C-alpha cells in the first residue's frame, strides 16, 4: 500500500484550520414506489392482489388490472379432473361493514372515485369439484409468454409460480372465508411449477356464514418458486378475501418489529448509514390523476381497511406498507423522516393533470379538508400526544412515542401559479400551527432555466425559510463540470443571485443520478467526484439523495438505480458502493484542499477531507478519474501517530455494471447458472503507524476513503 515515488501527487491537510460544519443530515436515501420497489419488493408480503382490489377501472382501461370479473389478477384457476365451476370478483360481500372514508373526493375527476371504496372478494360457484377446484396465488412474477412491455404486471404475464420460498422456512398464512351453501373442505398448500406439493396441507372446514379470519403456518419442504393453492373438494358456494403470506420473523428486517420488510434489502439500506429518508415520492406522491395521489389516511390503521390505488408509475400500490410503516422504516435505519404530501396539483408532466379547484366556497372547503387539514393531521399523527385523535391512532398501531417529525415536503417537481397558490395556503397553515416544522419547497424538475428561476423567485420572496428541493439527472460531463455549483461565490441559475449562506434558505438535492450510462462504472466516478463537492458545500446543501433507490429486475421504469433486486436477492451497483464508502464521514470539513501535481492542481483527482472532532479521526474521500495509478503523499500539520485504512473500488473497464448478466430474475423460466455476483466490490488495505508525511497508492479509476485513526 505504501507507494514508491512514481507519478506522484501530494495533498496538505491543515488539521487546525477547520472549515464548514458538515450537515448532520447530509447523506440520506429517497424511497419511492417506482420500478415495483414496494409490493413484491421491499415489502415481504408474498401474495399479489391479496385483497382482490386490482379490478377494472371503467373509462380508463389499464392492462395492469383485471378486465373481467372472471380474470383475477395475479391468480390462476385450479380445475382438476372433471371439475367445473367459476371464481369471480364481486362486491356483494364486503369484508368490512364500516370502511373508513376520510376523503370527500372531487366528483369532477375523470375517474369514478366511488369505485375505489368498493370492497371486492372472490365468489366460488362450484358445480362439480372433480379432483379439486380453486385458485392459486402466483405471487409477484413475470411470464416468459408476456407480450407487453417489461415493467408491467399484466394479467397474461403473472401466471407462473413466483413465490420464492426456502427450505425449512415457515410462512405465516392469513385469509378470510365466508360460507354460503358450502359444506366441504378447503385445502391450502404450496406447490411448485411442476405441480408438486411443497408444504404440509392446511385443511379448513365448517365454514361460517360470516367472514372469519383463518391463520396457519406453512413450512417449505424445498427451496423453489411456488404458488399458493386454495382448493375446494365439494360443490357449493363460498367467498374468499384478504389472503396474505409472510415469511417467518427470521427472514424479516429486525424480525418484523420495524415493519413487514425484507431483511436483505433493508440491510443494504442500513449499510448506507442514511441520516434522512424521503418518502413516498417523488412523482408517486403527486399522482397522475386525482385518486392516484397518495392520501396518507388511506394507508394507516388495520391493513384490511387500507385502500390501494393505481400509482403514478402505472401499477398497483396496495398500501400494505403505509405511512406508519415508512416512519418505522426510517426510525429503524436511524434516519430522520422526510415525508412528502401533495397540495392538490398532480404531476404536471403526466397526460391528465388535476388541479384542486378553489373557485367556490365548497371547493375551498374540500381543499382545506383534503389537503390542508390532512397535512396538519399528519403532523399530529407523527408528533401528537396520545390523547389527540391521530396521536392516539399512532399509539394504537404500536408507537406511543412520537416520531419527532421535523421536515415536511409539499409537492414535488411542480411549477406555476396554480401550484404556488396552493403551496401558499398549506405553508401558512402549517407554519401557524407548527412553526417548528421545516417545509421543503421545490425548484422544479430542472437544474436551471425558466422553471428553476421562477420557482426560486417565489421562494426568495415568500418562503426563504424552506429547504429547496433540487433535482437533476445528468451525464458524466455535467457532474464533472458543475462541481462548483454550490460554491459561495457561484451565481445561482440565471437571476444573478448567489447561494447566500446569510439567508436561511438551504438546498436539498432530493434526486440526482448520472442516467446517461445506466449504472456503468463511469457514472460512479462522475457522481462521486460531484458528491465530494456537495459535502464540501454542506453548509448550503444540507441533504442529498440518489434516485431511484430500488429496481426490481425486469420491471424497470428507470434505467439507473442504486440497488437492483429480484424475489431472492440483490445487486448493489457501484453507485451504491461509493455512497456506502462516502457515508463514513467526520462532522467538520477542512479548509479547502487540493491534490497537487507539482505546483499544479490535478484536475482529475477530486477530494473532500473531513475530521471527526470528537475522535480525531480524519476521512479523506478521493476520486481518481484517470486510469493511471497515482502515488499520493499526504502531509499533515501535526505530529500525531495514525493507523491508516483505505477502502476503495476501482476498475480498468468503466463500462462494467453490477446488475447481473440476466435480463430478469431467478424464477424466470429457462434461466440457468443464476447468481448474484457483483463484478466490482469494495477492497481495503491497512497499514501504519504513520506520522506527519506518508505515501499511499491510489488506483486508477478509483473511489477511495482513506481513514486516519489516531493511535492512543
Predicted regions and their residues:
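Active-site groove signature of glycoside hydrolases
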Residues: 232-233, 247, 280-283, 343-344, ...
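An active-site-proximal structural segment forming one wall of the substrate-binding cleft
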Residues: 218-221, 225-227, 254-274, 319-333, ...
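Structural preference for beta-strand elements that scaffold enzyme active sites
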Residues: 21, 26-28, 276-278, 336-338, ...
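Aromatic/acidic polysaccharide-binding cleft in carbohydrate-active enzymes
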Residues: 25, 34, 344-348, 504-608, ...
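Noncatalytic carbohydrate-binding groove/subsite architecture in carbohydrate-active enzymes
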Residues: 220, 228-237, 241, 385, ...
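C-terminal beta-sandwich/jelly-roll accessory domains of carbohydrate-active enzymes
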Residues: 625-712
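Conserved, mostly hydrophobic/aromatic
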Residues: 29, 175, 273, 330, ...
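Extracellular and organelle-lumenal recognition/adhesion modules and their flexible linkers in secreted
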Residues: 3-318, 336, 353-369, 417, ...
Amino acid at each position: 500500500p505504501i507507494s514508491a515515488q512514481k507519478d506522484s501527487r501530494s495533498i496538505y491537510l491543515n488539521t487546525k484550520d477547520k472549515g464548514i460544519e458538515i450537515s448532520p443530515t447530509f447523506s440520506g436515501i429517497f424511497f419511492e414506489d417506482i420500478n415495483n420497489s414496494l409490493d413484491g419488493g421491499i415489502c415481504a408480503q408474498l401474495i399479489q392482489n391479496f385483497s382482490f382490489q386490482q379490478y377494472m377501472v371503467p373509462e380508463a382501461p389499464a392492462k395492469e388490472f383485471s378486465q373481467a370479473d372472471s380474470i383475477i389478477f395475479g391468480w390462476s384457476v385450479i380445475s382438476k379432473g372433471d371439475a367445473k365451476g367459476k371464481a369471480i370478483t364481486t362486491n356483494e360481500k364486503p369484508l368490512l361493514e364500516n370502511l373508513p372514508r376520510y376523503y370527500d373526493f372531487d366528483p369532477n375527476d375523470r375517474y369514478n372515485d366511488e369505485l375505489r371504496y368498493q370492497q371486492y372478494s372472490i365468489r366460488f360457484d362450484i358445480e362439480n369439484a372433480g379432483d379439486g377446484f380453486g385458485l392459486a396465488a402466483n405471487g409477484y412474477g413475470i411470464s416468459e409468454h408476456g407480450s407487453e412491455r417489461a415493467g408491467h404486471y399484466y394479467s397474461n404475464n403473472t401466471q407462473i409460480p413466483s413465490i420464492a420460498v426456502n427450505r425449512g422456512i415457515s410462512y405465516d398464512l392469513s385469509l378470510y372465508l365466508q360460507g354460503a351453501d358450502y359444506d366441504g373442505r378447503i385445502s391450502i398448500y404450496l406447490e411448485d411449477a411442476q405441480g408438486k406439493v411443497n408444504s404440509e396441507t392446511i385443511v379448513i372446514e365448517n365454514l361460517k356464514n360470516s367472514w372469519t379470519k383463518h391463520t396457519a403456518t406453512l413450512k417449505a419442504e424445498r427451496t423453489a418458486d411456488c404458488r399458493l393453492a386454495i382448493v375446494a373438494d365439494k360443490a357449493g358456494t363460498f367467498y374468499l378475501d384478504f389472503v396474505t403470506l409472510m415469511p417467518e420473523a427470521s427472514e424479516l428486517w429486525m424480525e418484523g418489529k420495524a415493519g413487514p420488510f425484507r431483511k436483505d434489502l433493508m440491510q443494504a439500506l442500513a449499510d448506507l448509514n442514511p441520516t434522512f429518508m424521503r418518502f413516498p415520492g417523488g412523482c408517486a406522491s403527486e399522482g397522475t390523476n386525482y385518486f392516484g395521489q397518495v392520501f396518507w389516511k388511506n394507508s394507516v390503521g388495520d391493513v384490511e381497511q387500507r385502500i390501494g390505488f393505481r400509482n403514478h408509475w402505472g401499477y398497483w400500490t396496495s398500501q400494505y406498507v403505509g405511512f406508519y410503516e415508512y416512519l418505522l422504516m426510517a426510525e429503524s435505519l436511524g434516519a430522520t423522516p422526510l415525508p412528502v404530501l401533495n397540495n392538490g396539483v398532480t404531476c404536471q408532466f403526466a397526460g391528465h393533470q388535476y388541479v384542486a379547484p378553489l373557485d367556490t366556497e365548497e371547493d375551498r372547503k374540500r381543499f382545506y379538508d383534503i389537503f390542508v387539514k390532512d397535512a396538519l393531521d399528519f403532523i399530529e399523527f407523527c408528533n401528537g400526544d396520545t390523547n389527540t385523535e391521530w396521536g392516539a391512532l399512532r399509539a394504537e398501531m404500536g408507537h406511543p412515542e412520537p416520531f419527532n417529525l421535523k421536515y415536511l415536503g409539499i409537492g414535488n417537481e411542480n411549477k406555476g401559479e396554480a401550484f404556488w397558490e396552493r403551496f401558499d395556503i398549506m405553508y401558512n397553515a402549517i407554519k401557524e400551527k407548527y412553526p417548528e416544522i421545516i417545509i421543503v419547497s421545490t425548484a422544479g424538475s430542472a437544474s436551471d432555466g425558466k422553471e428553476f428561476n421562477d420557482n426560486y423567485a417565489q421562494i426568495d420572496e415568500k418562503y426563504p425559510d424552506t429547504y429547496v428541493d433540487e433535482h437533476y439527472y445528468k451525464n458524466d460531463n455535467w457532474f464533472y463540470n458543475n462541481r462548483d455549483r454550490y460554491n459561495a461565490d457561484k451565481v445561482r441559475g440565471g437571476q444573478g443571485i448567489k447561494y447566500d449562506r446569510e439567508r436561511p434558505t438551504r438546498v436539498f438535492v432530493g434526486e440526482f443520478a448520472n442516467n446517461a450510462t445506466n449504472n456503468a462504472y463511469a457514472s460512479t466516478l462522475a457522481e462521486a467526484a460531484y458528491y465530494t463537492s456537495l459535502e464540501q458545500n454542506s453548509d448550503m446543501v444540507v441533504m442529498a439523495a440518489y434516485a431511484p433507490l430500488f429496481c426490481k429486475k425486469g420491471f424497470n421504469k428507470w434505467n439507473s438505480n442504486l440497488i437492483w433486486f429480484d424475489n431472492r436477492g440483490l445487486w448493489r451497483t457501484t453507485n451504491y458502493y461509493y455512497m456506502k464508502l462516502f457515508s463514513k464521514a467526520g462532522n467538520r470539513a477542512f479548509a479547502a484542499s487540493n491534490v497537487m501535481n507539482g505546483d499544479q492542481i490535478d484536475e482529475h483527482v477530486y477530494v473532500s477531507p473531513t475530521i471527526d472532532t470528537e475522535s480525531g479521526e480524519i476521512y479523506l474521500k478521493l476520486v481518481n478519474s484517470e486510469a493511471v495509478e497515482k502515488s499520493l503523499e499526504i502531509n499533515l500539520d501535526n505530529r500525531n501517530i495514525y493507523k491508516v485504512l483505505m477502502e476503495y473500488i476501482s476498475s480498468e473497464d468503466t463500462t462494467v455494471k453490477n446488475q447481473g448478466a440476466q435480463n430478469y430474475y431467478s424464477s424466470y423460466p429457462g434461466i440457468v447458472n443464476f447468481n448474484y455476483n457483483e463484478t466490482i466490490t469494495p477492497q481495503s488495505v491497512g497499514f501504519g503507524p504513520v506520522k506527519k508525511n506518508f505515501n499511499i497508492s491510489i488506483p486508477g479509476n478509483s473511489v477511495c476513503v482513506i481513514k486516519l485513526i489516531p493511535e492512543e
